[in-house]
């Protein structure tokens, strides 16, 4: 249901605690005692694991409260903070008074000052901060009430991105605003996506802030891409056994434009509950989901097995490329995350109210698999950079010249060498919270001999471009990325 890559290359995977007994026991005879649970009052099975990618092993984690449909983010010091959840999980127990309101289906984002903002949630038309340096209250956001469709909602898990001017782009249902969250003021209202169909849960599409480039320009542009979803009324129709075909369109908008307009594109495959993942070379991967129905228990049909690559720098009509399909349906409550080696880890799928492994259309799926983008093909090994320095976990500062030394064994095209920085995202319900890719480019490439090269780059100049914290740093040569290393921007 939820997935987060950590700076130790572990992946934390969460599931709700009230499904009943899982297939993994807690260690050392531990059990969770909770009289509020509907399935098991005493549960000795695990509902969360940490997966070690390098060793292909996992360990059970014990969660104290129900993390069903909660939200999360990595703080600047590298800690995973989870907010909200269901039942007892709605109340922050581990950090007293961490939330002023119960949050379920909310969205988190790291702010330029390192705090978390928590936006929306079921019946929560507001936002709040964590930690709190002012009164422990919420701030009303009427936009979330205005985008709430009666009987369907269609505005849960809103798509939230930090704009380059420091304001928040917030998309819910079929439209968006730009919010000055410090003044609680809407500074821009964006047009409705043409057609007016919803893109937010349960008509679940996905969205990304496209890679930020040309970071030294005074008028840096930022673009958002929203893809997939379900036509209005799909949730109600699916609840009655009528599974409407998912949306086949994407909408792209320059959110920094003084007169922004959505530009529509058509995907090769209709998709609801799909995930959109930024790859280190600046491409976008669309993966998982269904071809009809909506999000929710038993409401999706026609699994979309083929991932699709979106190439944002190409002309309209040539941006999408269908990839090799999987054989495993990844429906409601599936998840994914980019790994440091450039693969995409995909796991889960459970459209049932409990664990159900047999005699159903889409059984509960516990497997993990890795999707390998074409840039990992061995035929590109001579083009693939290998980072020598800096070492992993190095600290870097804002607006500083930084040297990266790499080895590239093949012929080097210096104008096609670039460094990128990717913020690790918290994935749930087809959205990657805090996902962000910055293209640092290269200021200068110097040959050092023996296939070694020094690449000089300039780090982001402001916290508005890149909030402080841990990032994966890649070097990309002719669209072929190196393995990433962890760096801490401060």
What is the meaning of each model-derived region?
Residues 40, 61-67, 95-103, 144-153, ...:
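Short loop/turn motifs that recur once per blade in beta-propeller domains
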Residues 149-294:
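Beta-propeller domains
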Residues 193-203, 260-275, 303-306, 313-339, ...:
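Conserved blade-ending motifs and adjacent loop-strand segments that build the rim/top face
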Residues 1-4, 9, 37, 46, ...:
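Beta-propeller and closely related beta-sheet repeat lectin domains
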Residues 378-417, 486-490:
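Beta-strand/beta-sandwich contexts
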Residues 90-155:
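Asp-box/WD-like beta-propeller blade repeats and closely related beta-sheet repeat scaffolds
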Residues 37, 43-55, 90-93, 124-138, ...:
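Beta-propeller blade signature
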Residues 10-26, 30, 38, 46-50, ...:
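Immunoglobulin-like IPT/TIG beta-sandwich domains and homologous Ig-like subdomains
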